[in-house]
C-alpha cells in the first residue's frame, strides 16, 4: 500500500510520481542521512520530553508565534477539516528557521512574523539547539534532493523547484505520545486527529505503529514502521503546485490496541517553500484549477483554519 523507494535508484522519480498520484505517501530508504546526527536528534527529543513540566512550559509557544512547546491535549488537528473532536493525546516541541534567517526575512516582510518567529530553547538542555539545528539543516538538504527527483517525475528540470525553496520556512517538530495504558480515551479521541499537512513535503521518523492514511478505497490503512526509513507525504501546497495531480492525503495517529499503548515518539520535518514563492500549476498541458498564490499566504490561510 505504501511503497518503499530507494532514492538513489534511476527509477525513483517515476515511482515517486506514481505514489504521489495515488496514495500521496511513500517511504524512502538510502537517503544518506548521517546516523550519528539522527541519533543525536532522537536523544535530544527524549531528553526534552523527560524534562519537568515547568521546564517545558518555560518554553511554551508564545501567543502569536509558531515555535516552542505545545502541552499535552493542547491541539485538535482535526479542526483543520472542520471536525469537532476531543484534544489530541500528544505533546510537541517545534523549532523554525534560525534567528539569523528570521531577522533577515522579517526586515523584508513584517507579515511573515508568524513563520519567522524565534524559537525558545530550554536552558536545562544547552546541547539541544546544536543537535536539532544540525538535523534541521540535514533534513532540508534531503528535501531539496527529494524535490529534484519529484521535479523529474513531473517532467520538469531537476532544479525546477530550487529557486522556490532556497529560503524555505520549514519547521521541525518533536512529538511525544505518552503512555496510554492507564488512560481511557474519550469517544473519537486520537493521538493526532485526521488532517492533511499544509506545506510542500513532510518527512517523518517514527518509533512505533499508529500512523494511518486514507487509501484510494476511502479506508484507513496502517503505515508500517521500517527501520531507517522516512515516511514522506505530500502537503497541500505541493498538491496545488501540481494542479491536484498529486494527493495531499488525510492521515491520523490512532490509539492502538492494548499491546501497543505505550509511549510513542516521532520527529516530523514540515517543509514549506520560500515565503514569497509563487505556487501556480506546473502542469503545462492542463488548465489551472487554482489561481496563483504566494506560499506564505497559502500557509497562513491554512493555519487560520485551526484558530
Label every model-predicted segment.
Residues 1-307:
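Peripheral, non-catalytic segments flanking oxidoreductase cores
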Amino acid at each position: 500500500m505504501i511503497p518503499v523507494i530507494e532514492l538513489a535508484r534511476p527509477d525513483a522519480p517515476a515511482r515517486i510520481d506514481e505514489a504521489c498520484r495515488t496514495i500521496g505517501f511513500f517511504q524512502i530508504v538510502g537517503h544518506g542521512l548521517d546516523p550519528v546526527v539522527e541519533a543525536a536528534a532522537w536523544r535530544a527529543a527524549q531528553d526534552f520530553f523527560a524534562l519537568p513540566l515547568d521546564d517545558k512550559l518555560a518554553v511554551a509557544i508564545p501567543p502569536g508565534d509558531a515555535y516552542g512547546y505545545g502541552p499535552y491535549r493542547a491541539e485538535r488537528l482535526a479542526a483543520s477539516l472542520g471536525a469537532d473532536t476531543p484534544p489530541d493525546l500528544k505533546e510537541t516541541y517545534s523549532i523554525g528557521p534560525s534567528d539569523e534567517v528570521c531577522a533577515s526575512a522579517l526586515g523584508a516582510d513584517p507579515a511573515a512574523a508568524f513563520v519567522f518567529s524565534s524559537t525558545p530553547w530550554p536552558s536545562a538542555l544547552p546541547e539541544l539547539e546544536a543537535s536539532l539545528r544540525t538535523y534541521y539543516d540535514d533534513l532540508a538538504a534531503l528535501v531539496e534532493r527529494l524535490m529534484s527527483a519529484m521535479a523529474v517525475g513531473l517532467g520538469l528540470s531537476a532544479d525546477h523547484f530550487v529557486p522556490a525553496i532556497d529560503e524555505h520556512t520549514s519547521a521541525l517538530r518533536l512529538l511525544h505520545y505518552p503512555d496510554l495504558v492507564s488512560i481511557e480515551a474519550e469517544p473519537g479521541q486520537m493521538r493526532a486527529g485526521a488532517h492533511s499537512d499544509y506545506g510542500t513535503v513532510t518527512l517523518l521518523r517514527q518509533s512505533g505503529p499508529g500512523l494511518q492514511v486514507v487509501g484510494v478505497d476511502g479506508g484507513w490503512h496502517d503505515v508500517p514502521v521500517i527501520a531507517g526509513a522516512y515516511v514522506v507525504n505530500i502537503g497541500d501546497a505541493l498538491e496545488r503546485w501540481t494542479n491536484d495531480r498529486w494527493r495531499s492525503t488525510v492521515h491520523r495517529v490512532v490509539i492502538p490496541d492494548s499491546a501497543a499503548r505505550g509511549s510513542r515518539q516521532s520527529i516530523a520535518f514540515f517543509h514549506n517553500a520560500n515565503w514569497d514563492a509563487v505556487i501556480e500549476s506546473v502542469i503545462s498541458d492542463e488548465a489551472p484549477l487554482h489561481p496563483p498564490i504566494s506560499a506564505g499566504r497559502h500557509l497562513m490561510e491554512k493555519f487560520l483554519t485551526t484558530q
